[in-house]
A protein has these predicted regions:
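Short, small-residue-biased leader/transition segments that mark boundaries at the very start
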Residues: 1-4, 8-15
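Glycine-rich phosphate-binding loops of nucleotide-dependent enzymes
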Residues: 13-254
Length: 254
């Protein structure tokens, strides 16, 4: 990955214009905007949850515009907005959820059978490393865990996959202060390790404190690109609300 710059562009459902940008290694790029302005459609097109109806999505130097979710996952980790719908299988155990995307790998499967001891050892390592608290350890059902620990489990699973791009969508929604701090620390740690982190957030404080670069989305379009050190919270809020816009010249990447 290194200095490679990836371009992700596609038309959102709210606009005929293209959303075009690059996510760089070693930075947290934040897509900021008020809920309902195309962020969900954008993420679904990027991650493969919805079909990409036009434009291109390039990742790790490959066009993945029409690739399956599994193929996209070869270069991308995804911390989804809805941890219950897209992040966990609530009636599965914690250890089953932690290997959801990896159970076919030789480490965990042989001859069509799951290596239960390997899965257990892997889950116990992640539980310890990421301080995932659950009443019965690896065999705890995901449904019975607190929201903060459910989110820790998702982050542990996605980060441990060690992919060059981490897509984190509203990763602190519904969490308490302590859990929010843990999520923020992990995203910064991954940025510092050279990963590209794409953060989608509605929270102004979160956007300003974590981002190296900010793109504001309004009605399905990128209406401004900012350095968080050079814009105030108040001004950023105006862009997010559509009261201001910093239009790019035609053909310029936003």
């Amino acid at each position: 990955y290194g200095d490679h710059r990836d371009l992700h562009s596609f038309p959102t459902r709210r606009s005929s214009d293209l959303v075009s940008f690059d996510a760089r290694a070693g930075e947290i790029l934040c897509i900021a905007g008020i809920d309902g302005n195309g962020q969900t459609e954008f993420i679904h097109a990027l991650t493969g949850l919805d079909k990409n109806n036009g434009g291109t999505v390039t990742l790790c130097g490959k066009d993945i515009s029409h690739a399956s979710i599994r193929r996209r996952g070869e270069c991308m980790s995804h911390i989804p907005e809805d941890r219950h719908k897209h992040g966990l299988v609530l009636d599965f155990t914690l250890e089953q959820n932690l290997v959801l995307q990896r159970y076919k790998e030789p480490e965990f499967e042989k001859g069509g059978f799951i290596k239960k001891d390997a899965v257990r050892a892997y889950a116990e390592r992640l539980i310890e490393e990421y301080d995932i608290r659950s009443g019965q350890g690896p065999v705890t059902t995901a449904r019975s865990m607190s929201g903060g620990n459910q989110q820790k489990a998702i982050i542990a699973r996605e980060v441990d996959r060690n992919k060059p791009l981490i897509v984190a969508v509203q990763p602190t929604r519904g969490l308490d202060v302590g859990a929010i701090e843990n999520v923020h620390k992990e995203l910064v740690k991954q940025r510092d390790a050279g990963k590209a982190v794409l953060l989608v957030s509605l929270e102004l404080d979160e956007v300003m404190s974590l981002s190296d670069r900010i793109l504001v989305m309004y009605e399905g379009e990128i209406v401004g690109e900012f350095d968080p050190k050079q814009i105030t919270v108040q001004e950023l809020g105006l862009y997010m609300a559509g009261a201001k816009r910093a239009d790019k010249k035609e053909g310029e990447t936003a």
